[in-house]
């Protein structure tokens, strides 16, 4: 974390579902990462980032596994921020607010952001390991792909590397790895409010999910959203 923070003029962090694995607490994450809170706002030369924590408990539809929810305290805070901030605003969360693998109260969150669509220029998330863009109630949502793999689970266990590698890192057999790391650079034009995305292209190591018979979700296509890439994009604001 120190190396990451030291490598950037300003480093911001968002809590994901795996960050509290192995008994780690959110308080430890906040302390070690230097976060001001588990959800917070940050102004960067007029661009206002609203960073959220999608790991609240209390979802009435939670059926086990990792929580994926925004509780009443946080949604109340979000509404207040959206009302008080002038914009432009980018929403940042680990769990998706729309589309595949969205939080349990996705419709509620989409309604909250939709009410502030004149200020919210983009909402970005990780978690889903796909490359997808949606537009709902005037707000654009982008799933930023995983850095390194697509999870396929134990049913589709297979070897993409040498037996020595799989013996040392057994969980790799539950994934379809990317040959190169993926990341994206976002740029913002304060005059036009356009957001540019410079992504990365890679390829599968070993078999692709489609070759294994993986059908991740009816809404997703292999070679489309399910692919080892983050596409270059430009998001333009609709003139009013």
Segments predicted by a language model, with ranges:
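Alpha-helix N-cap/helix-start capping motif
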Residues: 103, 127-128
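Extended active-site neighborhood of metal-dependent phosphoesterases/phosphodiesterases
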Residues: 1-79, 83-84, 108-121, 130-188
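Short acidic, glycine-rich surface-loop motifs adjacent to enzyme active sites
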Residues: 80-100
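Structural motif
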Residues: 49-51, 90-92, 124
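A short C-terminal boundary segment appended to hydrolase-like catalytic domains
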Residues: 165-240
């Amino acid at each position: 974390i120190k190396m990451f923070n030291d490598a950037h003029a300003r480093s911001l962090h968002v809590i994901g579902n795996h960050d509290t694995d192995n008994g780690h607490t959110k308080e430890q994450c906040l302390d070690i990462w230097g976060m001001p809170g588990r959800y917070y706002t940050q102004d960067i030369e007029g661009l206002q980032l609203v960073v959220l924590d999608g790991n609240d408990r209390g979802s009435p539809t939670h059926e086990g596994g990792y929580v994926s929810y925004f509780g009443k305290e946080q949604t109340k805070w979000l509404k207040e921020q959206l009302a008080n901030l002038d914009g432009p605003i980018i929403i940042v969360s680990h769990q998706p607010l729309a589309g595949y693998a969205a939080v349990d109260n996705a419709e509620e969150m989409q309604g909250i952001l939709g009410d502030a669509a004149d200020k919210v220029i983009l909402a970005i998330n990780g978690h889903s390991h796909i490359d997808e863009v949606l537009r709902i109630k005037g707000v654009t949502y982008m799933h930023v792909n995983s850095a390194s793999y697509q999870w396929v689970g134990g049913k589709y266990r297979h070897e993409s590397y040498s037996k020595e590698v799989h013996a040392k890192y057994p969980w790799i057999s539950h994934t379809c790895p990317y040959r190169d790391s993926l990341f994206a650079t976002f740029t913002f034009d304060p005059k036009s409010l356009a957001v540019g995305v410079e992504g990365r292209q890679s390829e599968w190591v070993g078999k692709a999910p489609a070759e294994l018979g993986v059908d991740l979700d009816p809404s997703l296509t292999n070679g489309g959203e399910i692919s080892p890439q983050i596409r270059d994009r430009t998001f333009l604001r609709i003139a009013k």
